[in-house]
């Protein structure tokens, strides 16, 4: 039947399209069945798919009467022996336009031909990186005849959506919908193609675990910079370590997403946001260290600084400055009492023996008036006491100056602590608001926005 009747050279030529005359169109029914979504290369912007390209048409030359051939109604004929429509993938990315395997074609006695060749296509796909890794892509497969135009071949969709009956799920992508459409150009009557839209949504778990969560944890370490005491000397070191870690993650992102200037990926925006925050923390840490190590000999504390950073801001930030220690306060009160007593008893003197032991103490006024001993004691007393008082006053003034300087130094340290606490709350607020502002909307759209079945098909 096949060799003697159907495919005889006197009645069949596989190079001629099956049309009765040159003006007749040959209708080709096309349907795509997705077997596997192999990969989506974001950097090269290529989607690799394993599909079955169903093609159906009628060849009037391959008609026979089943009663004459023992009731045979179908034949499996090698596709190389019959005319085939030259349907190719127009938007391929590797130069392979045709199918991978030329399987047999199923020919019915009515001339209807069913051909289902498998193919692995690498198609160009414009990757939208704006919401990466919570993104949704729309990659297309565009099919059309390579040599026949619309006046010779009419391409029709046998189904509005690509089939997923034999689809193997992907570990990285979810299939949202696979709608197909027929495209015609009103300005070009010869143009015709069949386009399938592969609407796919990324599964973000891998990138959430390996990129987003580590970035958030590393950024949270920058918060500790403002809680770290200035005396430890590691504030800037911690900031630089965090900034270096974020730079490494930024280099990893640059190797994944395509090098496009049309949009910045979401994870890239977050990394840049955190790097700006960490850089800001470095600047503030340097300023805080500068304030912390100030002294009265180098800087003067203005009154507005005392008012704002020593009184108003600590109360607003719920900070309470500890008072002076009890030991130091008792020492100051004792020193004040002794100074007062020295002024009240300025005319008293002590008598000591040779080893320096105190034998007694008298006031000059207690001695008899006009006695020689009183005159000598008074002269000696005036000279020694004046020298002692001058020395004590010098020491007291020196201690008072040191105490005042130490108090001013403590005030500068407290100002630095208040600035640290202020920027700590600012950093936490900006970090939380910025993170939620960047991720909540794409995450909400990715998981909670339903896709209409009548528009996008089954999912």
Swiss-Prot record:
Cytoplasmic side: 229-235, 292-421
GO molecular function, one term: acetylcholine binding
Function: Component of neuronal acetylcholine receptors (nAChRs) that function as pentameric, ligand-gated cation channels with high calcium permeability among other activities. nAChRs are excitatory neurotrasnmitter receptors formed by a collection of nAChR subunits known to mediate synaptic transmission in the nervous system and the neuromuscular junction. Each nAchR subunit confers differential attributes to channel properties, including activation, deactivation and desensitization kinetics, pH sensitivity, cation permeability, and binding to allosteric modulators.
Intrachain S-S bonds: 125-139
Catalytically driven reaction(s): Ca(2+)(in) = Ca(2+)(out); K(+)(in) = K(+)(out); Na(+)(in) = Na(+)(out)
Transmembrane residue ranges: 204-228, 236-254, 270-291, 422-440
Protein's UniProt name: Neuronal acetylcholine receptor subunit beta-2
Site (Key residue for a rapid dissociation (K(off)) from the conotoxin BuIA): 106, 114
Topological domain spans for side Extracellular: 1-203, 255-269
Glycosylation sites: 21, 138
Source organism of the structure: Carassius auratus (Goldfish)
Entry's family note: Belongs to the ligand-gated ion channel (TC 1.A.9) family. Acetylcholine receptor (TC 1.A.9.1) subfamily. Beta-2/CHRNB2 sub-subfamily.
Subunit structure: Neuronal AChR is a heteropentamer composed of two different types of subunits: alpha and beta. CHRNB2/Beta-2 subunit can be combined to CHRNA2/alpha-2, CHRNA3/alpha-3 or CHRNA4/alpha-4, CHRNA5/alpha-5, CHRNA6/alpha-6 and CHRNB3/beta-3 to give rise to functional receptors.
Description of activity control: Activated by a myriad of ligands such as acetylcholine, cytisine, nicotine, choline and epibatidine. nAChR activity is inhibited by the antagonist alpha-conotoxins BuIA, PnIA, PnIC, GID and MII, small disulfide-constrained peptides from cone snails.
GO annotation terms (biological process): acetylcholine receptor signaling pathway; behavioral response to nicotine; cognition; memory; nervous system process; response to hypoxia; signal transduction; synaptic transmission, cholinergic
UniProt keyword annotations, A-Z: Cell membrane, Disulfide bond, Glycoprotein, Ion channel, Ion transport, Ligand-gated ion channel, Membrane, Receptor, Synapse, Transmembrane, Transmembrane helix, Transport
Site, Key residue that may interfere with effective access of the conotoxin BuIA to the channel binding site: residue positions: 54
Membrane topology: Multi-pass membrane protein
């Amino acid at each position: 039947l096949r060799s003697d009747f159907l495919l005889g050279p006197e009645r069949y030529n596989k190079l001629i399209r099956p049309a009765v005359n040159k003006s007749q169109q040959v209708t080709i029914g096309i349907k795509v069945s997705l077997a596997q979504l192999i990969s989506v290369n974001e950097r090269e912007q290529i989607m690799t798919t394993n599909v079955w390209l169903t093609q159906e048409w009628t060849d009037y030359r391959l008609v026979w009467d089943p009663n004459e051939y023992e009731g045979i109604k179908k034949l499996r004929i090698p596709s190389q022996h019959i005319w085939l429509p030259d349907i190719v993938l127009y938007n391929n990315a590797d130069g392979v336009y045709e199918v991978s395997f030329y399987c047999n074609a199923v020919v019915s006695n009515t001339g209807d031909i069913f051909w289902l060749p498998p193919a692995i296509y690498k198609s160009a796909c414009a990757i939208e990186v704006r919401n990466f890794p919570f993104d949704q892509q729309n990659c297309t497969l565009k099919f059309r005849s390579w040599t026949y135009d619309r006046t010779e071949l009419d391409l029709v969709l046998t189904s509005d959506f690509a089939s997923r009956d034999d689809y193997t799920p992907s570990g990285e992508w979810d299939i949202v919908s696979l709608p197909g459409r027929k495209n015609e150009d009103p300005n070009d009557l010869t143009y015709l193609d069949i386009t399938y839209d592969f609407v796919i949504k990324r599964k973000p778990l891998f990138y959430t675990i390996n990129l987003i969560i580590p970035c958030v944890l590393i950024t949270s370490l920058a918060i500790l910079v403002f809680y770290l005491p200035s005396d430890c000397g590691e504030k800037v070191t911690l900031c630089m370590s965090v900034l270096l870690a974020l730079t490494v993650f930024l280099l990893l992102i640059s190797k994944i997403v395509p090098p496009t200037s049309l949009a910045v990926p979401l994870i890239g925006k977050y990394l840049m946001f955190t790097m700006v925050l960490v850089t800001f923390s470095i600047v503030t840490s340097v300023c805080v260290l500068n304030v912390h190590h100030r002294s009265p000999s180098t800087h003067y504390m203005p009154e507005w600084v005392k008012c704002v950073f020593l009184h108003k801001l600590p109360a607003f930030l719920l900070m309470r400055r500890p008072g002076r220690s009890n030991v130091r306060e008792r020492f100051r009160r004792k020193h004040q009492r002794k100074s007062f007593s020295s002024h009240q008893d300025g005319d008293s003197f002590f008598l000591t023996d040779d080893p320096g032991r105190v034998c007694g103490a008298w006031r000059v006024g207690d001695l008899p008036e006009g006695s020689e001993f009183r005159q000598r004691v008074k002269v000696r007393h005036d000279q020694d006491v004046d020298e002692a008082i001058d020395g004590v006053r010098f020491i007291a003034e020196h201690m008072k100056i040191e105490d005042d300087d130490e108090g001013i130094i403590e005030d500068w340290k407290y100002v630095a602590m208040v600035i640290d606490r202020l920027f700590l709350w600012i950093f936490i607020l900006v970090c939380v608001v910025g993170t939620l502002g960047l991720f909540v909307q794409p995450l909400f759209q990715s998981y909670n926005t339903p896709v209409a079945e009548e528009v996008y098909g089954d999912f």
